[in-house]
Amino acid sequence: MNNKEVEKRAKIISENNNNLEKCLTTKALPSNVDVSLSEGLILALLKQGVRKYFAIFGHGSTDFAEVLRIYEEYGVTKTYNFKNEVEMAHAATALSWQYKEIPAVVTSIGPGGLQAMAGSLAASSNGVGVYHIYGDETTYGEGFNMQQIPKNEQDLYGKITALMSESYVFHTPEALREGMRRGYLKTKNPTKAGPFYCLLPINTQPKIIKGLNLVTLPSNKKIHLSNQISETNVEDFQKLTENIDKVVIKVGGGSRDFHEQVRKLSENLSAPVVLSPGSLGVLPDN
């Protein structure tokens, strides 16, 4: 890794209000850059609006932490150090859930990742988008690496995280765009978002991606679903409710962003609203 080049890019981004899109539009930064996987991931996340990192670093995330240090020195990113991975994952979930700002959780290799994974259940079960970045065993087939799962089987952490939500093992640095595309679609899913796990093998973190095209990386745009409700649907619903004495509205987790609409519908129909575990707080108790 050429620290001078990393510092140069970080400075340019900082001078452009930490807006990578602006840097590319004004050609302050070239579209194609030679960067390590670690820096490429930081740039890719920055383009998606991720600037806050909740971290407990270790030998599994040393290279990533070193690049992050440089970007923080120029004010592009902000890192918050924690002492407990479960607490860290919960804090990241709260930031994304309450303030609509997606952060990244960073751990080392082994037990730290498992702890953060346990904490990510809150994000997974409540449909909250958060990035999780864990150090991972090398791609050289050396077997489990230090405190990793002691079993001679390939890609164990990738399998576990894929079961928890969705994940990508960056075995090949050039696959960064594909991993980030999947992460974008998961963390910003308008109906069922969730945590996305990036597994960074120790040996691929410093590997250089030649000519990474920053333009093709996903941006920070929201994913919008087209409205499938027609006037016919509304008329049919109106006819249905006219012939029913009592209406009860059952509200699930997908209603969290539509509390005003749910309230108005409830008032117009004089109908009580039954909440589910994923929609608690959508409406006040009274």
Tell me what each language-model feature is.
Residues N2-N286:
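N-terminal alpha/beta PP-like core and its mobile active-site loop of ThDP/TPP-dependent enzymes
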